[in-house]
C-alpha cells in the first residue's frame, strides 16, 4: 500500500520532474562529497612530509568540497520544496475538481469539516514526504551503504564491530504497521475535530440562544483531547525507540574508539585511518538514527495522502452527456420516473408528467411528497433509478451538464450566498452581465431599492452566507440571481417563503412578466402563488393524484 500510494503521489509531480531531477542530482553530489571528504582528511593527517604543496592542495580541496556541499544542499532543498508544494497544490486541485462532480448523496453521508481536512491537512502531509522524507531515506540508505564500504576498505575488523553494534537499531521496521494505523486514527480524529468546530461556528447563534455553551465546550473540548491522545499513541513507539537508538549509537562509538586506540598502539592503523574512520562513524550512525524520523514522516504522509485519494476514488455517478443543449424551448417530460435516496423509502413512484414549453405549473403536496426531488432531477443533481426525464424530446442524460444547467435557473428555499459583494452574488449566475441587466433583475426581485439604500450599494459585502442580510433579503437576492440568468426554464422551490405579502406580490408580478415564453415550475404552499399557475399538479406519496 505504501509503495502504491507513493507512486500515485509522484504521478502528480510529473510537471516538476526537471526540478526534482536536478534536486536528486544535487543530493547525490552531497552524498559523494560526504563519502569523499574523510579520505581527504586521512591523507592530510597522514602526510609526514610537513606542510607541502600537496598538503595545501588537499586542504583547499577539502574546503572547496565542503563549500560545494553547502551549495548543493541549498539547491536540492530549494527545488525539492518547490516541487513538493506545487505537487500538493496539484493533488488538492484534482481532489476538489473531483468533489465538484460527485453526487449530492456523497455529501449527504459526510460532514464538511471532514472533507475540508482531507483536501487541506491530509494533502499537506505530502509536502514533507516529497521534500524531506523520501530524499532523506534514499540518501541515508546510499550514505550508509557507501560508509560501510569505506569502513571495510579502511579496516575490516573495526567495520565488523561497528555493524554488530548497529543491528538492534534496525528493529525499527517491526513497528511500521502499528505506526501507520496510529497515524490514520490521528487524521480521522482531526477531521472529526474540524467538523465539530465548523458546525459550532456556523451554529453559534443557536448555541447562545439555547444556552448550550457549556455543553458544546465539553463536546468540542473532548475532540481536542481525542486528537492529543491519538497523536501521542502514534508517536509513543518512537519515544520508546529513540533512547534505544541513542544508547546503541553511543555504545558503538565507545567500542570503535577503544578498538581503534588498540589498533593504533599495535600499528595496524594509522592516525589518519582512525580520524577517517571516526568521521565515517558519524556519517554512519546519522542515517541510521534518522531512519526512525523519516519512517515516521513517510507513515504520516502516506496515511494523509490515502485519505485524500479515497475521495478521488469515489465514483462519479452523474455522467456527462455529449449533446449541447442550445436554444431549447422548454418541453419537459417525466416518463414513469421512480427515485429513492439511499436507505430511504420510495420518493417518486413511476411518475409521468408532461409540461409543454411556456407553461407555468404549480407543484403542491405535503412535505416529503417528492416536489423538490422533481426539480432536482431536472437539473441532474440526482438521476432516477427508473424512467426517463426529457427536455425537448432528448433524454437529459444525453445533454452535457454545463449546457443543461445553463438553460435552467433555480431558486431554492435554502438560499446559499457567498461572502463577497451583492453585485458578485447576483452576477454569479451570469458573469458577463451588464450593470443594467443586474439592476433590471434586482428590480424584478423587489430588492433594488433596498440595495441602493445601503452605503456601498451593490458593492456591499454581505458576510459569510449573507449573514448581514435578513432571510427575506437573502431570498430576494437569490431570485435576482435566477432572473439575471434569463433561462428558458425557471424552477422556484418555495422561493418567496421568507418574504412579506407586499414583497411577494411584487415578485409574483415579476414572475408573471418573465414567465412569458418560459417554462416555470413552482413548488409552493401559498395559495397566492398557486393562482398564478396555468396548471396545478398535486403530488402525494410520490405519485400525481391530481393534474388540473
Language-model segment annotations:
Residues 189, 212, 236, 283-311:
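Cytosolic ends of transmembrane helices, especially the final helix of ABC transmembrane type-1 domains
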Residues 15, 104-105, 121-130, 134, ...:
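An intracellular "coupling" helix at the cytosolic face of ABC transporter transmembrane type-1 domains
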Residues 2-15, 115:
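A short amphipathic helical element positioned immediately N-terminal to and/or at the very start
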Residues 38, 134-176, 228-275:
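A hydrophobic transmembrane-helix motif
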Residues 2, 20-72, 152-157, 267-271:
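Transmembrane helix-loop-helix hairpins at lipid-water interfaces of multipass membrane proteins
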Residues 327-548:
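ABC-type nucleotide-binding domain
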Residues 99, 220, 334-336:
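Conserved catalytic Walker-motif region of ABC-type ATPase nucleotide-binding domains
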Amino acid at each position: 500500500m505504501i509503495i502504491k500510494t507513493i507512486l500515485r503521489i509522484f504521478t502528480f509531480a510529473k510537471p516538476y520532474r526537471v526540478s526534482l531531477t536536478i534536486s536528486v542530482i544535487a543530493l547525490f553530489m552531497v552524498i559523494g562529497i560526504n563519502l569523499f571528504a574523510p579520505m581527504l582528511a586521512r591523507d592530510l593527517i597522514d602526510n609526514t612530509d610537513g606542510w607541502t604543496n600537496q598538503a595545501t592542495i588537499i586542504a583547499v580541496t577539502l574546503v572547496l568540497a565542503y563549500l560545494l556541499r553547502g551549495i548543493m544542499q541549498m539547491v536540492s532543498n530549494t527545488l525539492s520544496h518547490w516541487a513538493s508544494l506545487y505537487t500538493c497544490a496539484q493533488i488538492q486541485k484534482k481532489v476538489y475538481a473531483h468533489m465538484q462532480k460527485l453526487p449530492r448523496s456523497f455529501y449527504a453521508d459526510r460532514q464538511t469539516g471532514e472533507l475540508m481536512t482531507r483536501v487541506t491537512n491530509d494533502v499537506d502531509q505530502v509536502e514533507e514526504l516529497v521534500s524531506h522524507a523520501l530524499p532523506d531515506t534514499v540518501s541515508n540508505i546510499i550514505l550508509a551503504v557507501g560508509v560501510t564500504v569505506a569502513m571495510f576498505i579502511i579496516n575490516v575488523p573495526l567495520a565488523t564491530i561497528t555493524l554488530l553494534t548497529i543491528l538492534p537499531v534496525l528493529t525499527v521496521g517491526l513497528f511500521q504497521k502499528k505506526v501507520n494505523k496510529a497515524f490514520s486514527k490521528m487524521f480521522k480524529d482531526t477531521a472529526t475535530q474540524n467538523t465539530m468546530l465548523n458546525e459550532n461556528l456556523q451554529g453559534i447563534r443557536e448555541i447562545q440562544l439555547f444556552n448550550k455553551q457549556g455543553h458544546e465546550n465539553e463536546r468540542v473540548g473532548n475532540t481536542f483531547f481525542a486528537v492529543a491522545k491519538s497523536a501521542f499513541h502514534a508517536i509513543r513507539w518512537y519515544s520508546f525507540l529513540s533512547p534505544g537508538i541513542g544508547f546503541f549509537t553511543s555504545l558503538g562509538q565507545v567500542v570503535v574508539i577503544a578498538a581503534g586506540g588498540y589498533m593504533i598502539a599495535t600499528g595496524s592503523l594509522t592516525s589518519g585511518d582512525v580520524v577517517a574512520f571516526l568521521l565515517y562513524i558519524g556519517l554512519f550512525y546519522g542515517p541510521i538514527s534518522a531512519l526512525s524520523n523519516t519512517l515516521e514522516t513517510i507513515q504520516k504522509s502516506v496515511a494523509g495522502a490515502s485519505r485524500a485519494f479515497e475521495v478521488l476514488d469515489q465514483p462519479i455517478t452523474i455522467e456527462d452527456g455529449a449533446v449541447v443543449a442550445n436554444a431549447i424551448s422548454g418541453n419537459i417530460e417525466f416518463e414513469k420516473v421512480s427515485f429513492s435516496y439511499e436507505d430511504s423509502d420510495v420518493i417518486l413512484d413511476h411518475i409521468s408528467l408532461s409540461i409543454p414549453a411556456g407553461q407555468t405549473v404549480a407543484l403542491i403536496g405535503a412535505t416529503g411528497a417528492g416536489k423538490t426531488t422533481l426539480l432536482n432531477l431536472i437539473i441532474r443533481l440526482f438521476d432516477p433509478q427508473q424512467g426517463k426525464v426529457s427536455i425537448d424530446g432528448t433524454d437529459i442524460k444525453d445533454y452535457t451538464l454545463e449546457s443543461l444547467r445553463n438553460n435552467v435557473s433555480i431558486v431554492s428555499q435554502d438560499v446559499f450566498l457567498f461572502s463577497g459583494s451583492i453585485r458578485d452574488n447576483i452576477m454569479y449566475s451570469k458573469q458577463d452581465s451588464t450593470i443594467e441587466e443586474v439592476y433590471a433583475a434586482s428590480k424584478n426581485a423587489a430588492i433594488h431599492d433596498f440595495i441602493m439604500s445601503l452605503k456601498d450599494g451593490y458593492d456591499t459585502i454581505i458576510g459569510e452566507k449573507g449573514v448581514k442580510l435578513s432571510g427575506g433579503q437573502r431570498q430576494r437576492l437569490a431570485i435576482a440571481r435566477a432572473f439575471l440568468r434569463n433561462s428558458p426554464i425557471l424552477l422556484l422551490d418555495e422561493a418567496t417563503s421568507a418574504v412579506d405579502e407586499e414583497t411577494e406580490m411584487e415578485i409574483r408580478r415579476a414572475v408573471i412578466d418573465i414567465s412569458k415564453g418560459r417554462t416555470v415550475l413552482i413548488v409552493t404552499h401559498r395559495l397566492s402563488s398557486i393562482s398564478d399557475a396555468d396548471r396545478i399538479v398535486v403530488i402525494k406519496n410520490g405519485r400525481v393524484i391530481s393534474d388540473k
